[in-house]
Amino acid sequence: MKNYTPKEIVEELDKYIVGQKEAKKSVAVALRNRYRRNLLPDDFKEEVTPKNIIMVGPTGVGKTEIARRIAKLVEAPFVKVEATKFTEVGYVGRDVDSMVRDLVEAAVRMVKEEKLKKVTEKAKKIAEDRLIDYIIGKRKKQTKNPFEVLFNYPSAEKSEETEEESMQYKREEIRQKLRNGELDNYVVEIEVTDTSTPMLEMYTNLGSEEMNINLQDIFADILPKKKKIKKVPVYEAKRILESEEAQNLIDMDEVIEEAIKRAENDGIIFIDEIDKIASSGYTAGPDVSREGVQRDILPIIEGCTVMTKYGPVKTDHILFIAAGAFNVAKVSDLIPELQGRFPVRVNLKPLTKEDFIRILKEPKNALTKQYQELLRTEGIEVKYTDEAIEAIAEVAYLINQQSEDIGARRLHTVMEKLFEELSFNAPELGGQQIVITEEYVKEQLKDSLNKYEVSKYIL
């Protein structure tokens, strides 16, 4: 886990997310506390648990993006789950343990990618030697003639040495051509490990995905690995062999051990739509998808051990970030025990016109910049006037006010409509510079302020 100060985390988040200072500060402090915990003595470290966060705010204001960005920033295993996908134990649907299994899978992928990067250069060298063998063909080593041994005949020895030198020269010549890309389109026959395994499915009331025992993995380990011959171009063979050799160089037991440790100590689980499992008002009979799910989630957030195919995983120090609009139910409608597991509560504000202007201008991945880059591939240079940016922001803001407020996601709809004609005609406009002005925006979006036409812009 990377070491960032809270201010540095907020500064990084500011590059992609506009406003919401309170939410950014909360997650920054939560991450810094994890770093502080790692510096504590082992006996005290176990006593410090993460301060889980619940974000309250309308859709499209940055709840999910904040969680995703911080996970990427500190290189922590991250998984996003929808609370509405889970049902109480015993009913059809995903059980809550699956969120921990998903987190471990994400951690394994992350650690494996890191290990593969470290062995890339070594794998390339081994793969190159293998590829040269396939191109020139493997030469069988000749057995020595017994008469040569008895009577010390030198001719065959010299012939073999000369042939060896010639072969070495040929290999170096091919190696140079490979590196220069001269043989890329040459078709070569290679032998690779067959990674496909027979499909085995077992149907239970939990569904095959929820089974703790992965039968395919078990049989893949028991059955001998088969080889298969493939005819592919050299550039493709290079990629296949490099990947296979890199896989052979990493120790999967070490990967799994590190992944479990990272998931337990650095993992972040983002539970979206948590307000949808809050019971509002009086409900008669069993509430399968609401209170039951809350009670099932409770032990995981509180800290328990979940069995995964990689081994047992403790959830005591996983950071949970929950989010919801809470426009129907309230946070207080969650069961008290669950509320107590989220000590940090943050309210995110709805976006204003000024926020929309900043969203279009400031982030590194702003939509305006995305459309500029997309059209640059066609040879078109797009520029915006300040008045045009303000007009786009105003249209998005007013549509949100007149219809369903979907936050910053509304900008996707407006920008797509704005660039519809330009994107369609782009291949014929190569080499031109297009300036998006206020008049152009008003012309393309002239119906957007008419409340009878607003439905066109609703996602």
Curated annotation (Swiss-Prot):
Q: Which residues bind ATP?
A: V18, G60, V61, G62, K63, T64, E65, D272, E337, R409
Tell me the compartments it is located in: Cytoplasm
List the CDD domains hit by this protein, alphabetically. RecA-like_HslU
Gene Ontology CC: HslUV protease complex
- Pfam name, any one: AAA_2
Under the heading Gene3D superfamilies, the entry gives: 1.10.8.60, DNA helicase RuvA subunit, C-terminal domain, P-loop containing nucleotide triphosphate hydrolases
Q: Locate the transmembrane regions by residue number.
A: none
MF terms per GO, please?
ATP binding; ATP hydrolysis activity; peptidase activity; proteasome-activating activity
Keywords attached to this entry: ATP-binding, Chaperone, Cytoplasm, Nucleotide-binding, Stress response
- Can you supply a Gene Ontology BP term from the record? proteolysis involved in protein catabolic process
Which HAMAP family does the annotation name? Answer: HslU
- What does the record give as the function of this protein? ATPase subunit of a proteasome-like degradation complex; this subunit has chaperone activity. The binding of ATP and its subsequent hydrolysis by HslU are essential for unfolding of protein substrates subsequently hydrolyzed by HslV. HslU recognizes the N-terminal part of its protein substrates and unfolds these before they are guided to HslV for hydrolysis.
Q: Hey, which family's this protein in? A: Belongs to the ClpX chaperone family. HslU subfamily.
How this chain assembles, per its entry, is: A double ring-shaped homohexamer of HslV is capped on each side by a ring-shaped HslU homohexamer. The assembly of the HslU/HslV complex is dependent on binding of ATP.
Q: What is this protein called?
A: ATP-dependent protease ATPase subunit HslU
**What organism does the record attribute this protein to?**
Thermoanaerobacter pseudethanolicus (strain ATCC 33223 / 39E)
State which gene encodes it.
hslU
